[in-house]
From Swiss-Prot:
The gene is Cbp80. This is Nuclear cap-binding protein subunit 1. GO terms for molecular function: mRNA binding; RNA cap binding. Residues 31-243 form the MIF4G domain. Belongs to the NCBP1 family. Its main location: nucleus. It comes from Drosophila melanogaster. It holds the Pfam family MIF4G_like. Component of the nuclear cap-binding complex (CBC), a heterodimer composed of Cbp80 and Cbp20 that interacts with m7GpppG-capped RNA. Component of the cap-binding complex (CBC), which binds cotranscriptionally to the 5'-cap of pre-mRNAs and is involved in various processes such as pre-mRNA splicing and RNA-mediated gene silencing (RNAi). The CBC complex is involved in miRNA-mediated RNA interference via its interaction with Ars2 and is required for primary microRNAs (miRNAs) processing. Also involved in innate immunity via the short interfering RNAs (siRNAs) processing machinery by restricting the viral RNA production. GO terms for cellular component: catalytic step 2 spliceosome; nuclear cap binding complex; nucleus; postsynaptic cytosol; precatalytic spliceosome; presynaptic cytosol. InterPro entries: ARM-type_fold (IPR016024), CBP80 (IPR027159), MIF4G-like_typ-1 (IPR015172), MIF4G-like_typ-2 (IPR015174), MIF4G-like_typ-3 (IPR003890).
Length: 800
């Protein structure tokens, strides 16, 4: 080949590659433009939704030949990710189907595949939105009503399955019921008898299902003034009301009605037979919940009426608002703006609906979807964006919550305390306290004075003591927290009579002179292990006085701030470990922290958290200490349970971490073995990335990881057994004593304690569930008092 020819060939190759890149780039630009047009259709613009749809159909129809798969994918994604625009996209698909029947069939197949995949992967919300979309396609003459009813019937068949959890059956019934508002009218007009048959099957199931879980999930134990309805019961009542109204609802926008003359001419597709995947033990289904109600129409001022509790509009509005929070919760400003831009805000008292839904999220049982502070920050942004109305609605809601606090669930009480204190801190701690002063006449354990006391404790964490004292009326003096200062007994007037005073003073001098841990040990070694009457828990296995002198002196010297305390603990970590060899010694350390910092709850929380992180004290020691006689006076205070829950969470995180590491190691080992086997069989010796020894864990390493996980599981089980056993002991003792004395056992103390037991079950339900059979065998036996046993049975019913 001549040099010239070679040069020409190179030029042609370069031009070919450049043209190919240009085509790819142009195609990408068109795809991006199509995606943008589809995503934004139906949103606010100068033209109507209908004209937007007509324009978009023309664009998509022209591009179907080239970008068919891309369009299918975008539309099916929109169906799942933008359920609030369901009817806009079903209308779009209907218009495309009217023009291109083949594309309509391909889309239905694609949507069915998405639905089946969502069920298989346990993506329950995605499955429900896919089902809703398929149902709404009946309204657009894309899918036949008969084939949809067959699918709905198949889903209701799941309610008759044996030996599967009730939560599985519940979800399939819920998915069908929540779809009916979209398609009920069309099915009623075309297939009334088949629809009635479907509803009858649902009613039979709802009448026989167990609702043992109901009481565990209620925000309030009382049904006055608003019933605390179980979610399926409430939705069923709303569907029955919709049926009485001949399936006519007033909330869902239906743009396809404008195009009825076009859509009714289109050929319809039949859904294929869809069989729900069978139950597997590793499937996790959504847990049941109770529908939260705070307002009714009498609470709202003149203006649009709040839809009734059993109107389908209430369900649709609430579901839409919940979805907005789910979509935008990462950015509070956007979330607040989207909530206030609710499309149908002129038809409803929007501020009341938003506040009710935000509190429904905050008080959701067993746990809220997001952190408490997420909801608090959203409410603050709402108040900033709508200062004329929203603060008043929020104040009204707070008043309602406070007046109903007597029957409030203990977990929700804690969340209410956390939210209100945080909210006050963002609004200069301003509140009309005088309106609540009637609570001062009540017993200190009553929920109302207890609420104010706990709120002030939390406000103290967000401010300072003098500020709290100044903001409160003088009548509230008994509820104001004590000044948070250390009570260092070796500096008190009576210190001369204490056995460890001399060594304590030596230790102060040494630590201030920046002594080493070894020097501290040397100072402490002369303290005798006897003659210390102040520590009854010492059984001779550890030196209680040595712990007393060291812990109180060191932490008093570090009392200036959290950082000073942490630095002191870290520097003398080895001394702590040497002193805390047994669980009794660890409990003694906790006792001394409490003795020193009893007036500073937050300091106790952070110090114990630090000791757990540094493995100075074990989780089981903290649990035992919390239930000790010494802490009886603190037992109903919120901070003590904050300590217990952070202790349990720390143990849970440790187990989860070890579990994850073991799974990853096993996976790497399996891949390495598989890769080694494949390379031996590969005659061409074409290897992928080689598996190095560093990547592949040895079988011995995996075995050690298994042993560590097994030990962690044993410790976790022991922790739960300690906690639940102590609960059973103190509650049984209270009930027996009340019965013997002829007193009503239903005291404030009893309600707090039974509430805390329930809280441990619900807050840590995923971990406790693993040991439910052990708990049933060892602790929650049939001979236990029914009041205590019922809490366990309600917990088990959540996943039953």
């Amino acid at each position: 080949m001549s040099r010239r020819r070679a040069h020409d060939t190179e030029d042609e190759g370069y031009d070919h590659r450049r043209n190919k890149r240009r085509r790819v780039s142009e195609n990408q630009e068109i795809e991006d433009r199509l995606e943008s047009l589809i995503l934004r259709v139906g949103e606010r613009s100068t033209s109507s939704v209908e004209s937007n749809l007509e324009g978009l159909v023309s664009v998509l129809e022209a591009d179907l030949g080239t970008f068919r798969l891309k369009i299918l994918r975008i539309l099916s994604d929109c169906a799942v990710r933008m359920p609030e625009k369901c009817t806009v996209y079903t209308t779009l698909v209907g218009l495309l189907n009217a023009k291109n029947y083949k594309f309509g069939g391909e889309f239905v197949d694609h949507m069915v595949k998405t639905f089946k995949e969502s069920l298989k992967m346990c993506r329950w919300d995605a499955a429900r939105y896919s089902l809703r979309f398929l149902a709404d396609l009946v309204n657009c003459h894309v899918i036949s009503a008969t084939s949809l009813l067959q699918l709905l019937d198949t889903m209701i068949d799941v309610s008759n399955e044996d030996t599967v959890p009730q939560v599985r059956r519940d979800w399939f019934v819920f998915a069908v019921l929540s779809t009916l508002p979209w398609v009920g009218r069309d099915l009623y007009e075309k297939k009334e008898s088949a629809l009635e048959s479907l509803l009858l099957r649902i009613e039979v199931y709802l009448n026989k299902r167990s609702k043992k879980h109901h009481n565990a999930l209620r925000v309030w134990s009382s049904d006055a003034p608003h019933p605390q309805e179980e979610y399926l019961d409430c939705l069923w009542a709303q569907i029955r009301k919709l049926r009485q109204d001949n399936w006519a609802e007033k909330h869902i926008p239906r743009p396809y009605l404008v195009f009825d003359s076009i859509l009714c001419e289109a050929l319809q597709h039949n859904l294929p037979t869809i069989v729900p995947p069978p139950h597997h033990d590793n499937f996790e289904y959504p847990m049941p919940w109770v529908v939260y109600r705070m307002f009714d129409y009498t609470d709202c001022p003149d203006g649009p009426n709040l839809p009734g509790a059993h109107s389908i509009e209430r369900f649709l509005i609430e579901e839409h608002l919940h979805h907005i929070i789910e979509t935008y919760h990462h950015e509070r400003k956007d979330c607040a703006a989207q909530l206030l831009s609710f499309p149908y805000k002129h038809k409803i008292p929007l501020e009341y609906c938003i506040v009710e839904v935000v509190f429904a999220e905050l008080f959701h049982m067993p746990t809220p979807r997001y952190l408490d502070i997420c909801y608090g920050s959203i409410l603050i942004e709402l108040c900033k964006l709508q200062p004329a109305t929203l603060p008043q609605v929020l104040a009204q809601a707070t008043e309602i919550l406070f007046m109903r606090i007597d029957s409030m669930n203990t977990s929700c009480f804690d969340r209410f305390v956390n939210w209100f204190s945080y909210h006050l801190s963002n609004f200069k701690f301003t509140w009309s306290w005088d309106e609540w002063d009637s609570c001062l006449l009540l017993d200190g354990e009553h929920p109302r004075p207890k609420f104010i006391q706990e709120v002030l404790q939390k406000c103290l964490r967000l401010s300072y003591h003098q500020r709290i004292t100044e903001m409160m009326p003088t009548t509230y003096a008994k509820l104001i927290p004590l000044t948070p200062v250390p009570n260092y007994k070796y500096a008190n007037e009576e210190a001369a009579n204490l056995p460890g005073t001399t060594v304590a003073h030596q230790l102060v001098v040494a630590i201030r002179q920046k002594c080493t841990p070894e020097e501290v040990v040397n100072i402490l070694k002369d303290i005798p292990n006897s003659g210390y009457s102040g520590e009854e828990m010492s059984d001779g296995s550890f030196n209680a006085l040595k712990i007393d002198v060291f812990v109180q002196t060191l932490l008093n010297l570090g009392s200036k701030s959290f950082s000073h305390s942490f630095a002191a603990i870290s520097k003398f970590h080895s001394v702590f470990r040497a002193l805390a060899e047994t669980e009794e010694a660890q409990i003694c350390i906790l006792h001394n922290i409490f003795e020193l910092w009893s007036s500073h709850q937050q300091m106790m929380v952070v110090l114990i958290d630090k000791l757990l992180k540094l493995q100075i004290v074990d989780c089981s020691a903290v649990a035992t200490w919390i239930f000790s006689k010494e802490m009886t006076g603190e037992f109903t205070k919120l901070y003590l349970w904050e300590i217990l829950h952070l202790t349990i969470k720390k143990m849970n995180k440790h187990v989860i971490k070890l579990n994850t590491e073991l799974s990853e190691a096993k996976e790497k080992l399996a891949k390495a073995d598989s890769s080694s086997s494949d390379s031996e069989d590969d005659s061409s010796h074409k290897r992928k990335k080689p598996i190095t020894h560093a990547d592949k864990p040895s079988e011995e390493v995996v075995e050690r990881m298994e042993e560590k996980l097994e030990a962690a599981n044993v410790n976790q089980k022991r922790l739960f057994l300690i906690v639940f056993q102590r609960f059973i002991m103190i509650l049984s003792e209270h009930l027996l004593r009340s019965d013997t004395d002829g007193r009503d056992p239903d005291t404030d103390w009893y309600r707090w304690t039974i509430g805390r037991l329930q809280q441990v079950f619900l807050m840590h339900h995923e971990q406790v569930q693993k040991y439910s059979s052990t708990l049933e065998t060892l602790l929650f036996t049939s001979d236990l008092d029914t009041h205590i046993l019922e809490v366990f049975q309600q917990f088990v019913a959540l996943r039953a």
